[in-house]
From Swiss-Prot:
PROSITE patterns: HWTX_2. It comes from Cyriopagopus hainanus. This is U4-theraphotoxin-Hhn1v. The lineage of its organism: Eukaryota, Metazoa, Ecdysozoa, Arthropoda, Chelicerata. Keywords: Disulfide bond, Neurotoxin, Postsynaptic neurotoxin, Secreted, Toxin. One of its GO terms (cellular component) is extracellular region. GO terms for molecular function: toxin activity.
Amino acid sequence: FECSVSCEIEKEGNKDCKKKKCKGGWKCKFNMCVKDI
């Protein structure tokens, strides 16, 4: 599934990339929605 709202992959130093939530119990990972376990 593609993210309904695409992830912002902006790395600042050693911070993790910013992630925007997908709908319905899914999460954004590598610009794809994966099941949030």
